[in-house]
Amino acid sequence: MEQMAKRLHEKMTRYNWTGFYLVDPADPNYLIVGPFAGSFTPNARIPLDRGLCGAAATTGKVIVVQDVSADPRYLAGSSLVKSEIVVPIFVNKKLAAELDIESYFAGTFTPPERQFIESCASVVANYLSTAH
């Protein structure tokens, strides 16, 4: 996961924060920041009922926001962020993690970009399912 976050961050120049949130083993009502690349995030622990990460966790669906200023669910980690995608990662039909990517550019996450990011999350899901 660490390598994937690092490589995506390095190679995809419009990705300004790339990382994973994991279901907190101590309290599954929270997500905790996992491996990431980019600036420090003040959102190291997120309740499942808050933010775009919480929305992806509770709905089980990919969340794509092309303009975070227009979405009241957005938890600001940086005032520079303009768009975000969150892809839930399931292992044995249970939420295990999320791939979260933020961009300083509005409209970054086009349908082909989304498909690519979902395929990256799928690789992580396969890895996690064999690691458990």
Name each model feature, range by range:
Residues 103-132:
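Juxtadomain coupling helices with adjacent low-complexity linkers
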Residues 17, 86, 98:
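Short hydrophobic/aromatic beta-strand element in the GNAT-like acyltransferase core
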Residues 1-40, 128-132:
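Intrinsically disordered, low-complexity terminal regulatory regions
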Residues 63-64, 88, 100:
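Conserved beta-strand segments that form the floor/walls of ligand-binding pockets within enzyme
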Residues 21-79:
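Regulatory sensory and allosteric helical modules in signal-transduction proteins
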Residues 93-103:
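Sensory beta-strand/linker motifs that couple input domains to effectors
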Residues 83-90:
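A short, aliphatic-rich beta-strand micro-motif
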Residues 90-95, 131:
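Flexible loop/coil segments at beta-strand boundaries within sensory signal-transduction domains
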